[in-house]
Amino acid sequence: RKMAAAAVNGAAGFSSSGPAATSGAVLQAATGMYEQLKGEWNRKSPNLSKCGEELGRLKLVLLELNFLPTTGTKLTKQQLILARDILEIGAQWSILRKDIPSFERYMAQLKCYYFDYKEQLPESAYMHQLLGLNLLFLLSQNRVAEFHTELERLPAKDIQTNVYIKHPVSLEQYLMEGSYNKVFLAKGNIPAESYAFFIDILLDTIRDEIAGCIEKAYEKILFTEATRILFFNTPKKMTDYAKKRGWVLGPNNYYSFASQQQKPEDTTIPSTELAKQVIEYARQLEMIV
């Protein structure tokens, strides 16, 4: 609390040994700090380290002034909007920093403003984008139950018509159908650039699942066929991925998996058939695309 007070006093021009600042002056100081953060964040290429420092100071101020709606304190509309705006920048900053735990923390706090205070505050321009990002985050982590819990909090109209919400909802449907080609195509139709981060994580997970099926169902696979099945658009990306999985390309341009095959007595017919069905489905995706 002393650190937060010092941050506010410094921004407001008060001495730490002087009289306590009025709530209005403290709010004004916090607003000034937010404007500094906003100015840096809105630059074409924001300094993420500087933004992180500003966010750290502002979080302390929010805690000191009880801006976060977790203390039972009655807050003014201006205070709530200021806190919400700061947290929204924090969530977006976390995506650029590729800091998933930070994004999850910011979203946990933001949901208080989006749901608990929705009748008291004007709707944020970033609300649907961030709620959609949160759905995509849960999907990328395979937290499907939580995905549906969060979805239940949203109006049916948003789920059906809002571009930010529809995107992760469609992705979840494609995954349930096994329509992996549609998931990969969805990357080219993201509603905001920030969605690419979690989609890439989701696509990597899908590739790993397909690659696991390839290893179980085939003794060898042609390089070009593997490239197509795994949805890579360049040979280099296929080569890099193969190295990551320990695949070795033979002189005949085949990847061999003999050493990774299960022993015949340990292989069950259902799992083998399922793997082959997945590969056969993937093989036909080129025609669909």
Swiss-Prot record:
Gene3D superfamilies: 1.25.40.990. GO terms for biological process: proteasome-mediated ubiquitin-dependent protein catabolic process. This is 26S proteasome non-ATPase regulatory subunit 8. Belongs to the proteasome subunit S14 family. Component of the 26S proteasome, a multiprotein complex involved in the ATP-dependent degradation of ubiquitinated proteins. This complex plays a key role in the maintenance of protein homeostasis by removing misfolded or damaged proteins, which could impair cellular functions, and by removing proteins whose functions are no longer required. Therefore, the proteasome participates in numerous cellular processes, including cell cycle progression, apoptosis, or DNA damage repair. It comes from Pongo abelii. Keywords: Isopeptide bond, Phosphoprotein, Proteasome, Ubl conjugation. GO terms for cellular component: cytosol; nucleus; proteasome accessory complex; proteasome regulatory particle, lid subcomplex. There is a cross-link at residue 236 (Glycyl lysine isopeptide (Lys-Gly) (interchain with G-Cter in SUMO2)). Residues 101-270 form the PCI domain. The modification Phosphoserine is found at residue 45. InterPro entries: 26S_Psome_Rpn12 (IPR006746), CSN8_PSD8_EIF3K (IPR033464), PCI_dom (IPR000717). It comes from the Eukaryota. Component of the 19S proteasome regulatory particle complex. The 26S proteasome consists of a 20S core particle (CP) and two 19S regulatory subunits (RP). The regulatory particle is made of a lid composed of 9 subunits including PSMD8, a base containing 6 ATPases and few additional components. Interacts with DDI2. Interacts with TASOR. Transmembrane segments: none annotated.
